[in-house]
């Protein structure tokens, strides 16, 4: 039976008169899948419901933050109790201490942390700190990696920028862009060449230890280690953008999983439990350069607000090492089911995984960087997305975004998803 999206269509027609493109973040417009966005109403566990009453198994999870699934009862209870006491004070609260300690305990190389209100704020602040500490201006990032919408970072970016086919953004001054150098992800030799030419001018390398905004692209062997060596040799800082990978890839984040310690880590998503949050952390020597301890300025009205700190603490305190065994078990089943169905119906495919992040690509080429990610059949992906939605499976509406698993997902959810793969691929093969 074909699902009705009539109320979503009406809501979108109204929204486009009120907000640019009808949304408050570009990827939500569903442009790359050639349909109007689906407006959501509620979520419980791994299931969400749209305003037309259609239900879905959710693999978007608000683009990653909801690692416990939707409306976890203990998290909801804690948020409500905190809200009843006050949503923000403009003064410190002890919950900031609790979340800070919890995060730092799981990141042994990080000694101090500053909370902000978004991942973009975290990466922008991390770059300012790196430039302030080193006295240098240039940075190196990787093509297709998305680090938020700060001017310095909207150069050959992924995520919604890639989805819309915009390699850069108008409004980024040329004087800013010239200080951002780029090479392909996983291209250590390219990074070495940049350092040979600009090593004395490079403040930092910023990298997703697992790229998550060109699909899911893990680092090849030696890539992160090589960046660590390059930055240390040339007096630059290594920034791991773990806004997406933080507590998704492993209990100790991607840096713990791969055994490479950066100078600065940026975080977001999971550490806010579904509320707006970001953070940057580093060694005490670096972080004590941040105001008011040091001269590098950073501030925020709602930074460390009680609601986000409470949601983050209640979420992280419910993750232990067994959580990631659960993710691996379900991820194995989901990957095997996708591969089996795609192979059965001769659908070109590649699967990349890292912890509870999974990337399905419609290409037979190994996906190791943005160029190979773009070899995926985008028209096929769009049809796949629409048909999976009809089967009650909600996926990211972009080839360049990964799927997420939560603790609320079960083997039954995975089995239903795999059954949908078979049904949809049978239709695509006709």
UniProtKB/Swiss-Prot annotation:
This protein's encoding gene:
hemL2
The N6-(pyridoxal phosphate)lysine modification is found at: 269
Q: Which InterPro entries match?
A: 4pyrrol_synth_GluAld_NH2Trfase (IPR004639), Aminotrans_3 (IPR005814), Aminotrans_3_PPA_site (IPR049704), PyrdxlP-dep_Trfase (IPR015424), PyrdxlP-dep_Trfase_major (IPR015421), PyrdxlP-dep_Trfase_small (IPR015422)
**What are the disulfide bonds?**
none
Enzyme Commission identifier(s): 5.4.3.8
- Please spell out the taxonomic lineage of the organism that makes this protein: Bacteria, Bacillati, Bacillota, Bacilli, Bacillales
**Catalytic reaction equation(s):** (S)-4-amino-5-oxopentanoate = 5-aminolevulinate
An example GO biological process term is: protoporphyrinogen IX biosynthetic process
The prosthetic group or cofactor this protein requires is: pyridoxal 5'-phosphate
Under Pfam families, the record lists:
Aminotran_3
Q: Which domain of life is it from?
A: Bacteria
Q: What is the species of this protein?
A: Lysinibacillus sphaericus (strain C3-41)
What PROSITE patterns does the annotation carry?
A: AA_TRANSFER_CLASS_3
Q: In which pathway does it act?
A: Porphyrin-containing compound metabolism; protoporphyrin-IX biosynthesis; 5-aminolevulinate from L-glutamyl-tRNA(Glu): step 2/2
Q: Where in the cell is it found?
A: Cytoplasm
Q: Give a GO molecular function annotation for the protein.
A: transaminase activity
Q: What is its main location?
A: cytoplasm
Q: What name has this protein been given in UniProt?
A: Glutamate-1-semialdehyde 2,1-aminomutase 2
Subunit and interaction comment:
Homodimer.
Give the UniProt family note. Belongs to the class-III pyridoxal-phosphate-dependent aminotransferase family. HemL subfamily.
**GO CC aspect terms:** cytoplasm
- The answer to whether the entry has keyword Isomerase is yes
